[in-house]
Regions:
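Expand to "…catalyze enediolate/carbanion chemistry for C-C bond making/breaking, isomerization
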Residues: 1-298
Length: 298
């Protein structure tokens, strides 16, 4: 698992925001070459991103770059510019199907070999934000071993579906849930869509908690104020950790050791799926702790 509770976007042509990247406590910082950069600014943004890959990650965040999709004819130029040391992954905008992913995998391998980077070291993150992308989410996710996460993009999805984007998000429910299920089926992390009403903290937290229950483990963020609540919501609570420790202890001592398939804990049945879920919670907490400790040393 890669810790991705917060995926914070910075326009690739915004020198001021990039200069603050090392101070930004997001798990993932994504330098953007797509929608937040006007066409005329793309060449400048590519240069700026390439020059700041190591700097942006010097505060301990993992660095991704969002690239333009193949249909724009800008993808190769983006990749030629940014595949260098310091880059951990690329996010492919408007992923339409597995052929898009395979083509990206091939290009990344060619660049890794040409530039002396470890083959397979650069991960792929898929932005699922069209009707076609939603339908092909699972085939796309398994099209390359590099794929480690899927982001649901609500803004472009609602545009493609010709519906209004709302804070309540009822119009997104099918696609949002489908993306989370596709990610889990492929063994990837599901990253929730950006919440555009960034000043409405209460609504953001409510929406994020709902997404967590759909299976999302992180969120694409557009404002620094969203980082702290995202970390809080996507990190198992102390109560959850205590519950998980208790489940593991009781099941191992009273179940596994005595040949029982189910035991009782806090008045509820605990069987193998509950036990495995508890172990997953503890593993997540351990990985988050290791990630945060590494950040402090950066």
């Amino acid at each position: 698992m890669t810790v991705m509770r917060s995926v914070f976007y910075i326009p690739g042509n915004n020198e001021k925001m990039i200069s603050k990247a090392p101070e930004t406590p997001a798990d993932i910082i994504t330098l953007d070459l797509e929608d937040s950069v006007p066409p005329a600014e793309k060449p400048k943004a590519r240069d700026m991103v390439r020059e700041n890959l190591k700097f942006a990650g010097s505060g301990g965040s993992t660095i991704f770059v969002r690239i333009n999709n193949w249909e724009t004819l800008m993808t190769n130029d983006d990749l030629e510019a940014i595949v260098h040391e310091g880059l951990s992954g690329v996010c492919l905008a408007k992923t339409g199907g597995p052929d898009h992913v395979q083509r990206l995998d091939w290009k990344l391998e060619e660049l890794e070999r040409r530039r002396g980077l470890k083959v397979g070291s650069i991960a792929i993150q898929l932005l699922i934000e069209t009707a076609k992308g939603v339908i092909n989410a699972y085939p796309s996710a398994i099209a390359s071993k590099r794929v480690n996460s899927l982001i649901f993009g609500a803004v472009d999805y609602t545009k493609d579906m010709r519906v209004k984007l709302t804070i309540e998000g009822d119009e997104q429910l099918y696609a949002r849930a489908h993306n989370a299920v596709a990610a889990r089926a492929a063994g990837c992390i599901a990253i929730d869509c950006p919440f555009v009403a960034f000043k409405d903290t209460e609504a953001f937290e409510k929406n994020t908690r709902f997404g967590r229950q759909l299976g999302y483990e992180g969120r694409m963020l557009i404002h620094p104020s969203q980082i702290e609540p995202s970390h809080r919501i996507y990190t198992p609570s102390p109560e959850d950790v205590e519950w998980a420790k208790g489940v593991v202890k009781v099941f191992e001592e009273e179940g596994i050791a005595k040949g029982a398939a189910a035991v009782s804990y806090m008045g509820k049945m605990v069987d193998t799926p509950v036990y495995e879920n508890a172990r997953t919670i503890l593993a997540i907490v351990e990985e988050i702790a290791a990630f945060d400790a590494k950040r402090k040393k950066a």
